[in-house]
């Protein structure tokens, strides 16, 4: 995995790398491989994750159909939307 360092800004490159790794699921993979997981525990975890996904999907579908109220999105601490990050 590669990240470009622009203008010797290592902090920005590290943030970009961390975001890429998060998106790719590398941190989750490292956590899962950190210890042995019994097959029965793996099945139970995967089943619980599937139930969680199904509930989330059903909740989103109900909100779209108007059966549940839409949850308001949290407002950023910076105030106006997009003010925290300069345009590219």
Swiss-Prot record:
Residue ranges the record marks as coiled coil: none
Record-level GO BP terms: translation
GO terms, molecular function: structural constituent of ribosome
UniProt superkingdom: Bacteria
GO cellular component: ribonucleoprotein complex; ribosome
Record-linked InterPro entries: Ribosomal_bS21, Ribosomal_bS21_CS, Ribosomal_bS21_sf
Keyword Ribonucleoprotein: yes
Chain intervals with Low complexity compositional bias: 73-88
UniProt region (Disordered), positions on chain: 58-88
UniProt keyword list: Ribonucleoprotein, Ribosomal protein
Family: Belongs to the bacterial ribosomal protein bS21 family.
Name of this chain's protein: Small ribosomal subunit protein bS21
Organism: Mesorhizobium japonicum (strain LMG 29417 / CECT 9101 / MAFF 303099) (Mesorhizobium loti (strain MAFF 303099))
Lineage: Bacteria, Pseudomonadati, Pseudomonadota, Alphaproteobacteria, Hyphomicrobiales
Gene transcribed to yield this protein: rpsU
């Amino acid at each position: 995995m590669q990240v470009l360092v622009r203008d010797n800004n290592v902090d920005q490159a590290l943030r970009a790398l961390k975001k890429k790794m998060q998106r790719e699921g590398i941190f989750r993979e490292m956590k899962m491989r950190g210890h042995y997981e019994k097959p029965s525990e793996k099945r139970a975890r995967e089943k619980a994750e599937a139930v969680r996904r199904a509930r989330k999907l059903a909740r989103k579908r109900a909100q779209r159909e108007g059966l549940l109220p839409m949850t308001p999105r949290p407002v950023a601490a910076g105030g106006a939307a997009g003010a925290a990050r300069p345009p590219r």
